Amino acid sequence: MISFTLSLIALLLGYFLYGRFVESVFKPDSRPTPAIAKADGVDFMVLPGWKIFMIQFLNIAGTGPIFGAIMGAKFGPAAYLWIVFGCIFAGAVHDYLSGMLSVRHGGVGLPELVGYYLGDNTKKVMLVFTVLLLVMVGAVFVYSPSIILGDLTHWNVMLWVAVIFIYYIIATMMPIDKIIGRIYPLFAFSLIFMAVALLACLFVKMPNLPELWDGLENRNPAAGPIFPCLFITIACGAISGFHATQSPLMARCMKHEKQGRPIFYGAMITEGMVALVWASVSAYFFYDGGAEEVGSTLKASAPQVVTAVSNSWLGTFGGVLALLGVVAAPITSGDTALRSARLIVSEFLHFDQKPIAKRLMICIPLFVVTSLLLWFNIANEDGFNVIWNYFGWANQTLAVFTLWTLTVYLVRQKKPYIITLIPALFMTTVCGTFLAVSPIAFGLSTTVSYIIAVVVFLFSLGWFVRWYSTQK
């Protein structure tokens, strides 16, 4: 429990110390925000700061800080280090600066920002890449909550699939304050309750968790080498490119720029804490007899761990409330993913989104593609894993593009660009190595993949040095 407690304290200190430093680098000011300058009553409108935080937290959470942390815990105590350092120095910086850059550029989406700083050709690639990623999120986050709801209610799973998909359609189309602004705080309460309740259980039980000084060796070699596989497995709890597609939604609702640190940096730190709690619960589950206590096996899947631990530790009512939080996380990420896709396409096509007819013109093709991926997910026994594995790599690759965009911005503004350059180089190397070593890609040996990692790192650094020399 010592490593876990120190990790929690480190995340809190990271928000108050490093978060304040990153804010001072950006220098928020009193200029009008997009919510005021471009108010349209649909996507651009002022919302209360606490509500924006709740929505941002749910938008970025998904199942990543829960399922990802559970799967990542199997690697051992190294998961603690990645969650803490990744969250403070990479993920929260990525989320804050991408959100604030969107504010400064009128609330535009990620492809527009990438195009402005990395060029029009990169923007076109990013547009297709981002929309496909968001549609994958929509498809993946329909079926998994339907299974949990089916178990809770004993209703047919396909009925829940239909209900959630219909909700996606409505939430994607409606003004942001009509549905998302009203029900998200309730969903966020369930998710936060789950994390706080499990945190309390950990301190009451005081289990003998693996500590950092026990060694950082890979305790789950079947999942691949710690580098890069741990850094892809635990994404949303440390850094996630998907977040940069969600931050512009809230950038369009902020009253003033000073709200940025608690909303963007703070939501990421909160997500890191959720990931840390689940990684610790899972470490107890896998390594200290927790599996026997809740009546499950060491090889249980992430959803099985969630269900078993929630019901056993929190009782019937608490377990149901906790599971509702787990259900709310993917549903609320799925609907805002499709909403982001609509807005990104509308920006590219210059479609005014106030008339509902023009919203429909974009939404219908998006829903058709999402439904096809959903059908593949359901019809194939391994469909979820196939989509999820590609999503995991695509998600971190998106973070790479965002970090390089932020680095170019900081260089041009003559600000300390090192805060994004180091994460950009690291994540570029992670994604390149994963592409080499992963069975879903080239499946090369670890030795060859690490040689490729060195080449990717040196090439990326060389590209940056060459580009930087042209900026003086």
Residue ranges and their predicted role:
Residues 1-19, 72-102, 111, 319, ...:
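Extracellular loop-to-transmembrane helix junctions
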Residues 10-66, 259:
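Membrane-interface "cap" regions at the ends of multi-pass membrane proteins
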Residues 10-11, 89-106, 110-174, 235-239, ...:
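Helix-loop-helix module between adjacent transmembrane segments
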Residues 48-64, 201-207, 215-278, 321-333:
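Hydrophobic, membrane-embedded alpha-helices of multi-pass small-molecule transporters
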Residues 107-121, 143-161, 249-272, 305-306, ...:
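Helix-loop-helix connectors at the membrane interface of multi-pass transporters/channels
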Residues 123-127, 131, 158-162, 266-275, ...:
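Loop-to-transmembrane helix boundary motifs in multi-pass membrane proteins
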Residues 138-142, 146-161, 170-172, 191-218, ...:
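Hydrophobic alpha-helical segments and their helix-loop junctions in multi-pass secondary transporters
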Residues 202-212, 265-308, 378-382:
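Extracellular/periplasmic helix-exit of transmembrane alpha-helices
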